Design a protein with these regions (language model features):
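Alpha-solenoid helical repeat scaffolds
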Residues: 58-59, 95-99, 129-136, 149, ...
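N-terminal leader/linker segments that initiate helical-solenoid repeat arrays
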Residues: 1-44, 49
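Canonical positions in the second alpha-helix
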Residues: 46, 85-86, 119-120, 153-154
């Protein structure tokens, strides 16, 4: 029966609607309340069926960052375990690496976040979204040279949001004022 690849169009059409209708509802995704039980229970069901379900991984990351509790005796006792399972299931899914990197960075694990961003960039070097998000990370950790390169890829290929450009400009201005 499962697990299913979230990116597979056949599985998305045949199996995803049932999982999302009963377990990954808008209330579960937003962590407001569970559909068939607890929020965590519905997220667990969704991620058992689709280990690399991008939106559910974002939700489990938010759940953990907001202090949600995982059962110690559960077979997947932490958000990290869900990400590790998703990566083991489909190591070529660059989006999973980016979502995990974002989670790690927000949690303060900069070195591990960097590894996941690098993995995502290696899997999808031309992805404007991945270049943009990784560029934001590199600005935040002070690697402006790398951030500029990633921004160039993103913006040369049509990325519409100006946030990375603005962050780079602000970081450059701060560098110049410190140099004075």
């Amino acid at each position: 029966f499962c697990p299913f690849d979230y990116r597979d169009p056949v599985n998305k059409q045949a199996n995803l609607p049932v999982v999302e209708a009963f377990h990954f509802t808008p209330d579960v995704e937003s962590l407001r309340r569970g559909s068939t039980g607890t929020v965590l229970g519905d997220l667990q069901y969704t991620l058992r069926a689709f280990p690399n379900h991008h939106r559910a991984l974002k939700s489990i990351a938010r759940y953990a960052l907001e202090g949600g509790r995982f059962q110690i005796d559960d077979y997947i006792p932490s958000a990290d375990c869900y990400f590790e399972r998703a990566i083991a299931f489909r190591p070529d899914d660059a989006a999973v690496h980016v979502i995990y990197a974002n989670f790690l960075f927000k949690r303060g694990d900069r070195d591990d976040a960097r590894k996941q961003y690098e993995e995502a960039l290696g899997l999808a070097p031309e992805s404007v979204e991945i270049n943009y998000v990784a560029g934001l990370y590199f600005v935040d950790v002070g690697d402006l040279t790398r951030a500029r390169k990633l921004a160039k890829v993103a913006y040369d290929n049509g990325y519409p949001l100006p946030g990375l450009k603005k962050k780079i400009a602000a970081a450059e201005a701060a560098e110049k004022s410190r140099a004075k």
